[in-house]
Amino acid sequence: MVLSVPVYACDGWSKSVGTKYANICYSNDRGLQRFTRGIGKESSFFSKGLEKEPAEAGKKVDLLVERVSRLLDMYPFDLRFNIYVYQNHRDIENAYTRITALGVFGRVPVAFYSHKSGTIYVSVENISAGILAHEIAHAVINFYFPEPPPERMQEILAQYVDKHLWE
């Protein structure tokens, strides 16, 4: 029996962009523009100004998901997750503390994936294509296997994605 993780469309967020694989949840247009710019492979003369279009964020996310799936050779048929785009790392710290319910002992990651909620948490302060691809790898891995592999194994695979993303 395969259980799908429920993904709710941006509960509590004021704005969202839907893509083939994700709901991008954000609070303001400027934050989404920074997110879109941050996840681009490189600045291109031809894409200048496109980061102002919400659909551009969706296109870039879907391209990253497809690249990650190819690298891992994992194509989950029911892949669907949320991406919560926060304004700064303090917001990530607060979300991490709330979700882990353990408090924070040590360093909070710059971004993280919660299998329980099917959500990637990122901040526009620290976003890059590599960081997002790493977290997308966790989502792909968790959706691919009926029982997600241990965290250390997932981390090895996600680091593989980091290393080979642009090859």
Regions inferred by a protein language model and the residue ranges of each:
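Cleaved targeting-peptide boundary
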Residues: Y8-S16
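Auxiliary, metal-adjacent structural segments of Zn-dependent hydrolase domains
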Residues: C10-D11, E53-K116, E125
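N-terminal signal peptide c-region/cleavage motif recognized by signal peptidases
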Residues: S4-P6
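Soluble periplasmic/extracytoplasmic beta-strand elements of cell-envelope proteins
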Residues: N23-C25, N82-V85, Y121
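Short pre-active-site segment immediately N-terminal to the catalytic Zn-binding motif
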Residues: S114-A133, Y144-P149
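Post-HExxH zinc-binding segment in Zn-dependent metallohydrolases
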Residues: P148-E167
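Acidic/histidine-rich, surface-exposed loop or edge segments in extracytoplasmic proteins
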Residues: G18-E53, V140
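Active-site recognition of the HExxH zinc-binding catalytic motif
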Residues: G130-F143, E155, Q159
